[in-house]
Amino acid sequence: MTKLAQWLWGLAILGSTWAALTTGALGLELPLSCQEVLWPLPAYLLVSAGCYALGTVGYRVATFHDCEDAARELQSQIQEARADLARRGLRF
């Protein structure tokens, strides 16, 4: 099972549970305070996931390390590829 399928199954289970609880399909009588929290729960979860993603990307960008050796190696490979393509008649 791919990661996408796992996420979709998880979202389907959470969504169906939320829908069943909010519509009363299970026959449970939830207190009014629980119902008031339950209705906007998907929006809260979406905003929380967005904040987590933004924080993770920001942290990874802030702690990104330069790979100077790999950059030099890549530049030399690019030069070799350009020279090979120039020998084969490709003009840049």
Swiss-Prot record:
TM annotation in the entry: 8-28, 37-57
Keyword terms of this UniProt record: Endoplasmic reticulum, Membrane, Transmembrane, Transmembrane helix
Any Pfam family hit: DPM3
InterPro entries recorded: DPM3
Protein topology in the membrane: Multi-pass membrane protein
GO terms of molecular function: enzyme activator activity
Localisation: Endoplasmic reticulum membrane
Highest taxon of the lineage: Eukaryota
Predominant subcellular localization, coarse grouping: endoplasmic reticulum
Pathway listed: Protein modification; protein glycosylation
BP GO terms, sorted: dolichol metabolic process; GPI anchor biosynthetic process; protein glycosylation; regulation of protein stability
Single GO cellular component term: dolichol-phosphate-mannose synthase complex
Family: Belongs to the DPM3 family.
Subunit structure: Component of the dolichol-phosphate mannose (DPM) synthase complex composed of DPM1, DPM2 and DPM3; within the complex, associates with DPM1 via its C-terminal domain and with DPM2 via its N-terminal portion. This interaction stabilizes DPM1 protein.
Function field: Stabilizer subunit of the dolichol-phosphate mannose (DPM) synthase complex; tethers catalytic subunit DPM1 to the endoplasmic reticulum.
PANTHER family the record matches: DOLICHOL-PHOSPHATE MANNOSYLTRANSFERASE SUBUNIT 3 (PTHR16433:SF0)
Annotated protein name in UniProt: Dolichol-phosphate mannosyltransferase subunit 3
Native species: Pongo abelii (Sumatran orangutan)
Gene designation per UniProt: DPM3
